[in-house]
Structure formats: structure tokens, C-alpha cells
């Protein structure tokens, strides 16, 4: 009888081994960084200069990141909130500059991130790509000497309300389970052909949370 009980217990343990192995493997899969699709939310500050002062604008955004082993494709949208002024050339205005009231901006950002090395749960990274920055509302001040002058100024304001620019990012994320917290800083040249041109470079500092939603590539089982 003792032998039968021992054999029965052994068979029961053997039957449980595959389930235990699967349970141990599942968390590892959930924490996998490679070939994953992260969705994220973030907040921070956008720092730039207008014609008279430096601006620190609160910024919120969403992002999507598709990873491989050491690289990732990164797409994000950010909204910055501010009220300030810019200027465009207008020979009919005093000082040949027409003041433009500016409100808020949005950035559409596409980059390639490199994750060169992992330090425990920390993953430092660097990114390079392009961003489209668009001012939400821009209205020239004052009156115009003629309809033609008004049309010219409005056309210049429209042309200077958006700008495509290179963007460079440095950051780090800390992985835990299927999530990751991160902090990053980006820099974009915005001096030329743009209403926000008080400084040669616009900076953005952000922090947020990424969630590993699903596999980016279907795994073979």
C-alpha cells in the first residue's frame, strides 16, 4: 500500500510539472521587452523663447513604441499649452515687424530609438528622427494698410505656423512586469521659418508610463 501511495504521489507531481513550468514561463513572457508594442502616456514641459521672454509650457502626450532587441520605432503626439507672441516681416508695420499672438502647439514625432545596453531593470536609450510642430492658433495684431498687405501677412503667418525639424532624444526607462516608467529629454532646432524663434533650439523634458500591451510580432508556438 505504501508503494502504491508513493507511486500515486509521484505520478501526481509529474502531472503538475508542465503546469508549473508554464506558470513560471508566463511572467517571463509578460515582462519581455523584445518584439513588444508599448502604449504610453506622459507629461512634462516644453522650453522655448519668443520675441520677448523664455517660455516653459506644460505639455501632455501619448506615444507608441514597437521594440526589437536593441532598437525601437517610436511615434508620439504632444500638446503644449501657452499664450505668447511671435513676429513676421511686414514693411507696413512699425519696425517692419508684425506682432502675432500665438496660442498652444502640437508636435507629431517619429524617431528610431537605440537601446545599447541593459543595467538590471534600467534601459538607457537615444533617439533620432523628425518632428512636425504646428501652432494651434496664430493671429496677427493691428490693422492693415490694404487687403493685399493683409493677405501677404496672413500667408506668412500660415507658412510660419508649422515646422518640420530634426529631433534628438536621450532617456532611460525602468521595467517592472509589463510596465515601464521613463524620463527623457529632446532637442529640436526651431530658429528659422517658425513663429517660435526666440531661441535656436526648443527643448522638451518628459516623464511617463509605458505599458507592454501585446506582442509586436506573432510568436510561433
What is each residue range found by the language model?
Residues 22-73, 210, 214-216, 221:
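Short glycine/proline- and aromatic-enriched beta-strand/turn motifs that initiate or cap beta-hairpins
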Residues 35-37, 54-60, 69, 102-108, ...:
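Residues that define the transmembrane beta-barrel architecture of outer-membrane proteins
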Residues 39-43, 73-77, 110-112, 124-128, ...:
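Membrane-embedded beta-strand positions of outer-membrane beta-barrel proteins
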Residues 43-49, 68-70, 77-83, 130-136, ...:
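Transmembrane beta-strands of outer-membrane beta-barrel pores
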Residues 46-50, 93-101, 152-158, 191-197:
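Extracellular loop and loop/strand-boundary signature of outer-membrane beta-barrel proteins
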Residues 51-58, 85-92, 136-146, 183, ...:
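Outer-membrane beta-barrel translocator domains and adjoining extracellular loop/strand segments
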Residues 63-146:
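Gram-negative (and chloroplast) outer-membrane scaffold detector with strong preference
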Residues 82-86, 168, 173-221:
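Predominantly the C-terminal beta-signal and adjacent terminal strand-loop region
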Amino acid at each position: 500500500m505504501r508503494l502504491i501511495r508513493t507511486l500515486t504521489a509521484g505520478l501526481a507531481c509529474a502531472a503538475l510539472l508542465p503546469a508549473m513550468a508554464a506558470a513560471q514561463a508566463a511572467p517571463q513572457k509578460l515582462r519581455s521587452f523584445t518584439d513588444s508594442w508599448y502604449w504610453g502616456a506622459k507629461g512634462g514641459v516644453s522650453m522655448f523663447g519668443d520675441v520677448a521672454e523664455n517660455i516653459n509650457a506644460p505639455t501632455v502626450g501619448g506615444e507608441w513604441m514597437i521594440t526589437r532587441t536593441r532598437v525601437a520605432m517610436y511615434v508620439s503626439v504632444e500638446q503644449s499649452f501657452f499664450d505668447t507672441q511671435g513676429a513676421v516681416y511686414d514693411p507696413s508695420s512699425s519696425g517692419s515687424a508684425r506682432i502675432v499672438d500665438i496660442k498652444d502647439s502640437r508636435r507629431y514625432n517619429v524617431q528610431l530609438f537605440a537601446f545599447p545596453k541593459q543595467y538590471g531593470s534600467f534601459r538607457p536609450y537615444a533617439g533620432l528622427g523628425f518632428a512636425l510642430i504646428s501652432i494651434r492658433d496664430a493671429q496677427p495684431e493691428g490693422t492693415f494698410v490694404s487687403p493685399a498687405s493683409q493677405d501677404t501677412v496672413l500667408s506668412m503667418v500660415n507658412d510660419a505656423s508649422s515646422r518640420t525639424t530634426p529631433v534628438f532624444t536621450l532617456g532611460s526607462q525602468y521595467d517592472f512586469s509589463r510596465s515601464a516608467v521613463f524620463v527623457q529629454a529632446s532637442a529640436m532646432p526651431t530658429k528659422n521659418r517658425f513663429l517660435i524663434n526666440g531661441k535656436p533650439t526648443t527643448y522638451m523634458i518628459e516623464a511617463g508610463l509605458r505599458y507592454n500591451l501585446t506582442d509586436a510580432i506573432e510568436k510561433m508556438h
